[in-house]
Amino acid sequence: HNNTIEIPQTVNGGYDFSHLSLKGIVIKDEDLSNSNFAGCRLQNAIFQDCNMYKTNFNFAIMEKILFDNCILDDSNFAQIKMTDGTLNSCSAMHVQFYNAAMNRANIKNTFLDYSNFYMAYMVEVNFYKVIAPYVNLFRADLSFSKLDLINFEHADLSRVNLNKATLQNINLIDSKLFFTRLTNTFLEMVICTGSNMANVNFNNANLSNCHFNCSVLTKAWMFNTRLYRVNFDEANVQGMGITILREEENIPINSDTLITLQKFFEEDCTSHTGMSQTEDNIHAVAMKITADIMQHAD
């Protein structure tokens, strides 16, 4: 009994898998560029070392799927429903992920330059060592997610929900975070130099070694927040509401005096590595974050 099926070709020379149900398939080292997987159901699927340039996955349903070392540039993942999916060591630039639902996705060692995650639902996603300048995450839901070693320069994270997320070693230089929700979030070594963060909400957040120098923080919310070595140098903090938690004590602070209180956040530094907050140093840290990402990107 022969199980092979003839897959028709698309007009652009790819394969047409649209609306098929594919379970347990393993495709290695194939050219699937311009293929069509629209409305496809993929369960326990593995794509390894494949060229999937301009592939269409619109409305596909993916469960336990792995893209390993694949080229996904200019592909369409809009409105997919993905559960427990992984993108490892992929190039996924200029990809459309808008309105995608990607529960518990794992995205690591991957390039996402200029990709579009508008209104994507990405709860409990794990981003690790990702290069994503100019990425659009406007209105995406990233609550409970974990982000470590990310280059988000010039990215748009406005109105993103990052409630209860963990952000470590993030380069957000010149990015947009207005009305972004960072409530109950843990932030360590997050660099937002020159970013637009008007109306951002940091209530109940825990910030350590973060840089907001030269950023716009007008009307930002920072109530019940723990700050440790946070740099507001030359930031615009007009109309910002802030109370700082120290032990169990809640201390209200006038935003106008915020910048003069730098030393206040530098206490009890013995357990932390010293880092002066000069412009050169911040740039060096941003470069180091990028270097650390790149180290394993190949």
PLM regions with names:
Residues 2-287, 294:
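Tandem repeat scaffolds
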Residues 296-298:
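Short acidic DE-rich linear segments
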